[in-house]
Amino acid sequence: MNTLLKKKSIICACMNREKNLKKSLDSWLSSGDADEIVIVDWSSDTPLSFEHPKVKILRVQGESSWCLSMAYNLAASLASGDILYKLDCDYIIKEGFFENHLPEDTFYCGNYKLARDDNEKHLNGCLVVKKQDFDKVNGYNENIVTYGWEDSDIYNRLEKTSERKDINFDFIQHIPHEDSKRAFGKDVNKLIIENKSIAIKKRWLSTSKKSSYFITKQKEKTI
């Protein structure tokens, strides 16, 4: 199938970031190119909801702390598209984003080394990948349960079978906020070092077991 005709799924996970999500979601819908937007509400204090036929919000109850690896693995499992566009809830996309990031035998990901300012470094987590390739590497390493290195870990595993290409930062921007909010008050550099060590010691394999959850679909209501 022509890549242009393949079904495109935006996947996102969020915990108490509804203001940023609202700004980002407007840009995702304005693009008109995504076939569906799957959002996992990771036990936000106030349940997320949004009324739009392309938007599917599913809530995980009872999680006291943010875990990107588990939240995004769940979002990916709920997506029906051929191509996954993994966006954080503070990523705004611009016109041309989709047509400039269509993977064949490739995947696209953020590269902080190409950042033109400190804020663009936070686009490192953006990932565009065929769902079959994401599933082949079994998604994110769920042994990494805090912020940092989960993106580098999956990029390293994807590179074993696909060519890595850089996200074009001209078509995406990050909504600025403090690192302390991202890492929930913990030292970011320390977390990255710790999680890199975990990824080496506890390799994530195609046979590694993912977590499972009881999820509920949100009532349709505009936020």
What is each stretch, according to the model?
Residues 138-156:
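Donor nucleotide-sugar recognition loop
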Residues 7-9, 36, 153:
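Cell-envelope/extracellular polymer assembly enzymes that use nucleotide-activated donors
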Residues 8-20, 24, 31:
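A conserved hydrophobic helix/loop-capping motif in glycosyltransferases and polysaccharide synthases
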Residues 152-223:
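C-terminal catalytic/acceptor-binding lobe
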Residues 108-123:
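Short beta-strand-to-loop element that shapes/binds the nucleotide-sugar donor at the catalytic cleft/hinge
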Residues 25-63:
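Acidic donor-binding segment of Leloir-type glycosyltransferases
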Residues 81-92:
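Short beta-strand-to-loop acidic/aromatic patch adjacent to the donor-nucleotide binding site
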Residues 62-79:
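Glycine-rich, basic loop-to-helix element that forms the pyrophosphate-binding segment
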